[in-house]
Every structure is written in C-alpha cells, then in structure tokens.
Amino acid sequence: MAGHSKWANIQHRKGRQDAVRAKLFSKLSKEITVAAKMGDPDPDKNPRLRLAVKEAKSQSMPKDNIDRAIKKSQAGDGDEYEEIRYEGYGPNGVAVIVEAMTDNRNRTASTVRSTFTKNGGNLGETGSVGFMFDRKGTVTYPADVGDADTVLMAAIEAGAEDVESSEDGHVIWCADTDLNEVATALEAELGESEQTKLVWRPTTTTELDLEGMQKLMRLIEALEDDDDVQRVTANFEASDEVMEQL
C-alpha cells in the first residue's frame, strides 16, 4: 500500500529516541488502562485489551508497565478519558487523521487546532478527510515466517482481504471488524505475529518532495508531542530517495 512501509519506517526511526519512547510508553499505558476499564481486565476475554497489550509488547514495553496499566483500570478512581478523532489538512494538502484520548475535550481541541495552524495546516470538521481512508486491521509477520505463497494461503484461510509481501516482511490486511478472528487464525498457522493493530489505510495519496516531507514531519511530530494524542496518520507518498534524506 502506498506510503505504508514508509510510514512504518518513520515510526521505527522515531522510536529509537529515548524521549519519544517514554512518551510512547505513556500513550500505550493509557490505551491499555482504557481498554481494560471498558471491558474485562483479562486480555484473553477482551479483544481491544489484547490488541493494546500486543502493541505494547511489539514496542518493547516492559511487562511491569503493562501489568501496572491493567491494575490501574481496576483501582476505581483515576481520570475518565474520551476518545476523539480530529481531521484536517497538513502542508501541501496532505490529509491527516489525529486520534486522541483526553480528559478535557476543550483543551485538546484547542491544542490540536493551534498545532495544525502553526505548522502550515488547518483543522477541519469531522469527516473532512475521513473519506480518503478506510479503517482496516493489519497483522505483520517477519519475512522469514514463510514465502509469499505460504503467507498468502494462510491469509486466505484466515479470511484476510489482502497481503503485501516484501523483503521487509508480510503485511496482511483485513476488515477492521475481523481483526481479532483473522489474527487468531493466522497465529495458529504461522505463529505469533510481530504486530496486530487497527489502522487508517489511505485510498488516495499525495506525493511529497523533500521539503514537503520535512514540513509534514514537523506537523506530525508536534501533534505526537501532545500527551492527549494517541496516533497520527497521513496520506503521503514519497520516493525512497526523499525518505533516505529525512
């Protein structure tokens, strides 16, 4: 999918920075706590919590942190978080979706709007760019789990929609509502996946040169620096040469 592997590479490179990593762990903990509070504190009985725990493990979050986040959900106190999605345009008309989890809607809306404005973008209404994305589930495996045909057959049997295989690994796509079932079936056939998550998959992309990518990254990093923001997705496309210069 256009932009997907490049997006993953950006996230991986950013994840090496300690400060970014600490903030990431904080966001992952919040997702785990909210998921556990909304359902069962046992990941085996709570699909959303299972996904949150798996994502935390894929980012090398310590088990103690994960357990502490689950226990926090059962404490009976703490903040009540509301999930909100913001949509807008970044530099060069790139569509941007911001997923937030906040205990103060007004504060978060003000901060997100200001961040868009200061970084060459503008915040739109809900639905203003959402039509350019599909909500999908993804299950990722390393390249050595099997060849493309082996993974494709397993994906078809599991009820997946699409498979992208490359030297970097295999990305299996499915309907968002089928992610838990598809991931479970794949793990029975191929073993534990590297990552299982819900994403926004762009249906159209905007090609950016180096200057455009640098401007977009400034916006994305500023948005991600907000503690209320959980995830940022953009429908950019860029050449390998541009990506290497970032």
UniProtKB/Swiss-Prot annotation:
An example molecular function term from Gene Ontology annotations: DNA binding
Residues annotated as transmembrane: none
Compartments (UniProt record): Cytoplasm
Record keywords, A-Z: Cytoplasm, DNA-binding, Transcription, Transcription regulation
GO aspect biological process, one term: regulation of DNA-templated transcription
GO cellular component, one term: cytosol
Annotated Pfam families: TACO1_YebC_N, Transcrip_reg
Principal location class: cytoplasm
Family: Belongs to the TACO1 family.
Name of the molecule in the record: Probable transcriptional regulatory protein RD1_2018
Species for this entry: Roseobacter denitrificans (strain ATCC 33942 / OCh 114) (Erythrobacter sp. (strain OCh 114))
Lineage: Bacteria, Pseudomonadati, Pseudomonadota, Alphaproteobacteria, Rhodobacterales
